[in-house]
Design a protein with these regions (language model features):
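Nucleic-acid endonuclease domains
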Residues: 1-134
């Protein structure tokens, strides 16, 4: 696992935290400011080889992370903290991370009522876990 401190000279464009962090991560690596997209994991990646997540992010529909990752186009997985530090993980590290900090919730009935795997809130324990492995 490696880390990257993200750029501080970046003006937020999105209210949605996931879109903002995806855009910030790309800007930090390339200097490009591009609109965040909404590509399904089996069709493409958030950026280059990366799948980018933060606290409370949805990982996949249902509980089967292995099935989801079998079709995910990403080869590296990024968790970005509230302090805008990116932890870049291999698939094996990401599986361990989601097993430790993922939860299964149910979508509202209005939106189909299906189960989904999500990351929980960012906690001290989560940050310590990442720091110990970086």
């Amino acid at each position: 696992m490696t880390t990257l401190t993200l750029a501080k000279d970046f003006t937020r464009e999105y209210k949605n935290n996931g879109q903002h962090l995806e855009q910030l991560f790309r800007y930090s690596l390339t200097g490009e400011r591009v609109k965040a997209d909404n590509i399904k994991a089996d069709k493409g990646t958030d950026f280059a080889q990366y799948s980018i997540k933060s606290a409370r992010a949805t990982i996949c529909k249902g509980r089967d992370l292995a099935k989801h990752l079998a079709t995910d186009k990403a080869t590296e997985f990024v968790y970005i903290t509230k302090t805008e530090i990116a932890y870049i993980m291999s698939k094996a590290e990401y599986i361990e991370f989601v097993a430790e900090f993922g939860t299964v919730t149910r979508e509202s009935q209005k939106n189909g009522g299906y189960e989904k795997t999500r990351l929980g809130h960012e906690t001290r324990v989560l940050i310590e876990w990442l720091e110990q492995r970086a």
